[in-house]
Structures are given as structure tokens and as C-alpha cells.
Amino acid sequence: LIALEERELPGLLGDLSGLDVLDVGCGTGRWTARLVASGARVTGIDFSRGMLARARQRVGADQVSLVEHDLGLPLPLGDGSYDLILSALVMEHVGDLRPLFHELARVCRPAARVVVSEMHPAMMLLDCQAEFRDPRTGRDVRPVSHAHPVSDFVMAALGAGLTVEHLSEHEVDEDLQRRSSRAAKFAGWPLLLLLIFRA
């Protein structure tokens, strides 16, 4: 999933130089570092103190503003603060998307974009969800995931006053199957959902 996302998403982000960007659910800074390298002024927000510490190490404390916060609560950010918001592989962990989209719309500047990448909800039919290994314990962790239909994203965004600019579904192709034996079992299934909303 990450390989497919990292191949497809950058082309949708455009020129970020000089933009104020919010990385929602930034985790360990996988995208935060790329956003900073692209010349953006970046704020990363995540509920996990440990992940934010890793993001700070990856990006550099002086390069980014990192905020510890639960996305289920109103964002501790000012109205109209951002030109672009990125939510990469995060929203499946949010139970109700509507309050989050209202908050994202609130912190958008006029004509700002909200870019969302997400595991396609069809993957839940295959009992596939986010999983990672905790480096401290060595245990596999499966955070709570919600199989939001595509319409949940669209309706939450429209309800928050955003418009739909882009929606695409991406399958595992032959290139990914060659690069990853695990990817082959998902051939023919939509794996990645990409959406862009406009304020």
C-alpha cells in the first residue's frame, strides 16, 4: 500500500514551495519530511507522543512544528491557516469523519486543497487493515480501523463546505506485483483511494 501511495500521491501535491501545509496524522514523519524538503512550512499533528518524537528526529525540530493532539477533538489551530492539508493513510482510524472534515475546512485558507490518501475500503473485505511492529516490544499492532465507504469521505467533505476536485482508485499493477510478493494477493482489487477536496 505504501509503495503504491508513494508512487501515485506526489503528482497530486503539486508545487509546495512557500505553502503552509498541515500533515494530519503525521505519525513518524514519513510525509512530513518530504513536505519540508519540497519547501513547505509544515505543521504535523498526531496523537502519539512516541511517533512525534520519531518525526522530530527524522525532520529536525527546527524544520517543523509538531503538535500532539487527538483528531477526534477540535484542532488547536487557527482558522484559515493552511494552503494544503494532507491526510495520508489516517482516516480509516477515525470513527466519524464529519467532525474532522469540518475542522479541516475551518483551518483551510480560501481555495486550499485537502488531499487524502487511504486504504481502499474494499481491502476491509479481505480482512486487511493497517498493521505495524512496535519497535519497543516487537509485537504486531493493529490499530482500530473503520471501513468507510467512499461516499463517507465525499459526503463528510461536502457537508463541511468543500468541493470534490479529484477521486481515483488504484489497483495493484504488474510493477507492484514484481516488486512485492505480498502485493500479488491483492491483484484485481482496489488498494488505494486518493481524493482531493477544495475549500
Predicted segments, located by residue:
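Short alpha-helix
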Residues: S145-S168
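Conserved Class I S-adenosyl-L-methionine
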Residues: T163-A199
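A short acidic, Gly/Pro-enriched loop at the edge of an enzyme's catalytic core
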Residues: L75-L84
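A short glycine-rich, Lys/Arg-flanked "PGG" loop and its adjoining helix->strand segment in the class I
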Residues: R98-R113
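Conserved alpha-helix/loop element of class I SAM-dependent methyltransferases that forms part
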Residues: L1-L19
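Conserved class I S-adenosyl-L-methionine
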Residues: R113-R139, V144
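A short SAM/SAH-binding and catalytic strip from SAM-dependent methyltransferases
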Residues: L84-L97
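Class I SAM-dependent methyltransferase SAM/SAH-binding core
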Residues: L22-V24, T28-L73
